[in-house]
Amino acid sequence: MLKKEINVVILAAGKGTRMQSSYPKVLHKLGGKTILEHVINIAKSVKPKKIILVYNNKEKEIKSKISDTSIDWVIQKEQKGTGDAILKASKKFSDKDDIVVLYGDMPYISIESIKKLFTSKKQSDISLLTAYVKNPDGYGRVFKKNGKVIKIIEEQDANFHEKKIKEVYSGTFIANGKDLKRWLNQINNKNIKKEFYATDIVHFANLENSTIKTVQVLNCKEILGVNNKLQLSILEKIFRKKQVNDLLLSGVTLKDPNHFILRGILKHGKNIEIDTGVILEGNIILGNNIKIGVGSVIKNSFIDDQTEIKEYTIIENVKIGKKCIIGPFAHLRPKTVLDDQIHVGNFVEIKDSIIKKESKIKHLSYFGNSEIGSQVNIGAGSITCNYDGVNKFKTIIGDNVLIGANTKLIAPIKITKNATIAAGTTLTQDVNTPCLIYNNKEQKQKKNWKRPQKIIKKTDQ
């Protein structure tokens, strides 16, 4: 017998009105990714023949965030229920394939639980993913008689006794495509909400004496969904705890695990030390022997071995070499590349610049659109004046240049290697020889000068 292929249907057409948001529920972020991206990753993990995504009329918003070309898109213009959504998706799947249904707002279903469904399907016509919970409020109840699944009863349609049932249905199931289409075409909307419930297929499967099995999730948290911002915050907390545990087990030292946030993916070497209040976003790569100080924020960046990021430093889309010292209170902006042994000190901002080995910018400076050579030392309060209100211009500084404090470099400008720029200089022309550059500024003295006195107003008396 040939092995059946898997199609995954993801239901993501709900309006999500309880989120009190102007954009779709499934596009809210969880751990740096949209909820829907998490579910798509779950779907991909089973290596399906096809992923079919049912969405609502927010097509442009959803497709702008989900650019995966392998997905088959199906629109549900009117929200008539989950049964109607799967029926619309059924035009995209084959009778002979097995169909797994996932919900776009349930990002924690595990691959292990889905594999249990696959195993169960070998001995059943339809297998349902369920959980035993202490508080079943809000979930459909699995109604059984003598151990046999009879039907799924939605919360709003359940009577007093049915609401006491502790086995609840997650919404995820697996069934053959041909069977599923037949059952879907029999459901109606004769219920309190006047919707076509996907859960009704269990009733029709039972009428045919089909074999219906239930499979329990490995962890009850897997069935948690998102309907409002409170539930999203609960899922975020669970997600963060798992991330922290994984990092600790992988050897990362977190000084305060309860106040560390990772919104993305962290790849790291050995001897990583992260202090309290640090936020990492996007794709982060850390080498060996890295220290990150209190309150730092790092986004989509690479940091090489033996580099220290001091307190309250912000780094975004930056590549940093080995044995660098950055901060405290430094700001490295996109397109910045630092070579090895660079020192960027407090209140220094660098944007779209390349800085070569062993150079230093240690205090109160701004460098944008710059190329800085090796062993350059830049004094406090130095800035590149790189913008004329319309265009950005480049500053190029050669190797072993010394720039004194409070210097202004009016771009476009180039300074040759070994040149020295005196403190307080405003540089407007290229420096083509390794000389000393300074501005003549006469120091004047005004004798018998007195400081102005404060004028005392009547209201001050």
UniProtKB/Swiss-Prot annotation:
Positions contributing to UDP-N-acetyl-alpha-D-glucosamine binding: 11-14, 25, 76, 81-82, 103-105, 140, 154, 227, 333, 351, 366, 377
Localization annotation: Cytoplasm
Residue positions binding acetyl-CoA: A380, N386, Y387, A423
An individual GO BP term: lipid A biosynthetic process
Keyword match Acyltransferase: yes
Annotated region described as Pyrophosphorylase, given as residue ranges: 1-229
Record's keyword terms, sorted: Acyltransferase, Cell shape, Cell wall biogenesis/degradation, Cytoplasm, Magnesium, Metal-binding, Multifunctional enzyme, Nucleotidyltransferase, Peptidoglycan synthesis, Repeat, Transferase
Region: Linker, residue numbers: 230-250
Known pathway: Nucleotide-sugar biosynthesis; UDP-N-acetyl-alpha-D-glucosamine biosynthesis; N-acetyl-alpha-D-glucosamine 1-phosphate from alpha-D-glucosamine 6-phosphate (route II): step 2/2; Nucleotide-sugar biosynthesis; UDP-N-acetyl-alpha-D-glucosamine biosynthesis; UDP-N-acetyl-alpha-D-glucosamine from N-acetyl-alpha-D-glucosamine 1-phosphate: step 1/1; Bacterial outer membrane biogenesis; LPS lipid A biosynthesis
Record bears the keyword Transferase: yes
Chain ranges passing through the membrane: none
One Pfam family in the UniProt entry: Hexapep
Source organism superkingdom: Bacteria
Spans annotated as N-acetyltransferase: 251-461
One Gene Ontology term of the molecular function aspect: magnesium ion binding
Family: In the N-terminal section; belongs to the N-acetylglucosamine-1-phosphate uridyltransferase family. In the C-terminal section; belongs to the transferase hexapeptide repeat family.
Function text: Catalyzes the last two sequential reactions in the de novo biosynthetic pathway for UDP-N-acetylglucosamine (UDP-GlcNAc). The C-terminal domain catalyzes the transfer of acetyl group from acetyl coenzyme A to glucosamine-1-phosphate (GlcN-1-P) to produce N-acetylglucosamine-1-phosphate (GlcNAc-1-P), which is converted into UDP-GlcNAc by the transfer of uridine 5-monophosphate (from uridine 5-triphosphate), a reaction catalyzed by the N-terminal domain.
Assembly and binders: Homotrimer.
Record's protein name: Bifunctional protein GlmU
Name of encoding gene: glmU
